Amino acid sequence: MAHRTALYDAHLAAGGKMVDFGGWDMPINYGSQIEEHHAVRQNAGVFDVSHMTVVDIAGAGARDYLRQLLANDVDRIDPGRALYTGMLNDNGGVIDDLIVYKRDNDYRLVVNCATRETDLGWMEKHAGGFAVDIHERPELAMLAIQGPKARDILAGLLNGSRADAVKSLKVFAFAEDGDWMIARTGYTGEDGVEIMLPNADALTLWEQLLEAGVSPIGLGARDTLRLEAGLNLYGNDMDESITPWEANMGWTVMLNDREFIGRQPLLNQKENGHSEQVGLILEGKGVLRAHQKVLMPNGEEGEITSGTFSPTLGKSIALARLPAGATGKVDVEIRNKRQVAQVVKPPFVRNGNAVYKEQ
């Protein structure tokens, strides 16, 4: 039987169509995926992301442990700030991408549900020699409230320091109030926050948000929103065989004086060359989909890793992995026919506007 979040019955009550996602029963949509997508771009939407795995890392060795475990460096941020990073294997491949929240005396990680067992096993394996406690927090729910009006609406529903945090937090900063953690982060390319809170509090906040005009958003629109924002989906755009250099995650790699797992293979690959992730926009009709073949004018080939129809742009878009230096026009094989696509630098959309640049 699949896992269910504390909001499972609320999803059904809102008309949610439930599907299996990484072993969880989650809503794919509540009626119209397109309308949900536009609601987040134009107003505000709430996502139940309680299927994500929350892990607290404490102990005197937590800092040194995470500096070895992660490709990005937790020393780059102060308490109250968050950091996006990859957790790599010995070959530099991405075991998972995650967010680290740095507190005064410990850290919180949010990792993907589909990689939970692999992640926890890897983290435990490499904890030897460090004074650390790795503690999963299944009693916490997680809601993402996203969109241009999201923070204003949410602040009006909360009191005191929680409302202040929603109004004043800078991007990738967070604040804690009791058992709540409020972070100005997201996966949509819009402004908003993500809140970790006790399962017992989640339903009340969910109902308040819907009553205030915030739309419930399913996994379908979550995917089109993140793809417009040029954000990776683990298992599609990267996995253990793909390095950060090949997944447009090079900016998350800190090659400073510390040793971290996968560092040497990354140095070798950076010196020897590697494929690159780019954006594609289809010039004609049709839909770009994962695993479609991309053909470059010089005869080299690549592959689409994620593709969809962009409701905001009214065009089909994709992320693709191509040989280094790809620019201009390429051909994509769609149903055994070649169609022309333009190579662009993602993201495609931010804050409701087209922002991509042709390459």
Swiss-Prot record:
Gene Ontology MF terms: aminomethyltransferase activity; transaminase activity
GO biological processes: glycine decarboxylation via glycine cleavage system
The protein's name in its UniProt record: Aminomethyltransferase
Quaternary assembly: The glycine cleavage system is composed of four proteins: P, T, L and H.
Organism of origin: Alcanivorax borkumensis (strain ATCC 700651 / DSM 11573 / NCIMB 13689 / SK2)
Annotated keywords: Aminotransferase, Transferase
Top enzyme category: transferase
Lineage top rank: taxon: Bacteria
